[in-house]
Amino acid sequence: MLKIGSHVSMSGKKMLLAASEEAVSYGATTFMIYTGAPQNTRRKPIEELNIEAGRKHMEQNGIEEIIVHAPYIINVGNTTKPETFQLGVDFLRMEIERTSALGVAKQIVLHPGAHVGAGADAGIQQIIKGLNEVLTPDQTVNIALETMAGKGTECGRSFEEIAKIIDGVKYNEKLSVCFDTCHTHDAGYDIVNNFDGVLNEFDKIVGIDRLQVLHINDSKNVRGAGKDRHENIGFGHIGYKALHHIVHHPQLTHVPKILETPYVGEDKKDKKPPYKLEIEMLKNGTFDEGLLEKIKAQ
């Protein structure tokens, strides 16, 4: 079974149940959530996440595994502000606890961090320090380090940087990787013409067994732009053919594929989610040039 879904919202009183219902309405077989707003530290207590009802709904609809994304505000790469580093460590610990409580997520996707001017090596050492403070040998979920585009002072812009972080961490069996197609393309890897070669390079440097999550996004920018701006499937510089190949890649059948493509529409207050139609299009193997108009008409 193709494990494909998108980012969905966990909100209101229904929380996990709402997320599962939204995913099912898109024809998804997996999904990704934030356990609270990605840009702040406000979190509902675990008891209010409506876990039991959400899990029951998932079970009824054949969804076995979901992904959690850590909030953007975590930056364990910060070497200049101890309070930012400490917030990242404390918050990541809390996210591990919350993700474990869900019982259906094995991976927490984490943007490794930004060195904020101290240089990549210093940032990587700080990320290693943070992960060593957080990870324990008995935790049940992995931290999936996301491949980054190289925007600003982001660490994790190359497979070598990801490998360096993993190698420095004591309990690194608790680390995996989230391969983001837009980020990897924007960082300079040729996933359009040579995805198999890129995957082979990843295997040599990091190890393909670590690749546990895929973020499937097209890109608004040319390869190597270092920008990180997602585009709808088939409407960017990566293109439908390459993304379809990645989604159906025989070496990655077990890996959940998560869409984070932009909502569609001119009116900011009335943008439509693209996921139902994008998932259908990735399943059926044919690019639909009229897709964006169909999304708007939903």
Curated annotation (Swiss-Prot):
Domain of life of the source: Bacteria
Cofactor notes: Binds 3 Zn(2+) ions.
Keywords: DNA damage, DNA repair, Endonuclease, Hydrolase, Metal-binding, Nuclease, Zinc
Sites where the protein binds Zn(2+) 1: 69, 111, 146
EC number(s) stated in the UniProt entry for this protein: 3.1.21.2
Binding annotation for Zn(2+) 3: 183, 228, 230
Sites where the protein binds Zn(2+) 2: 146, 180, 215, 260
Protein name: Probable endonuclease 4
Organism: Bacillus anthracis
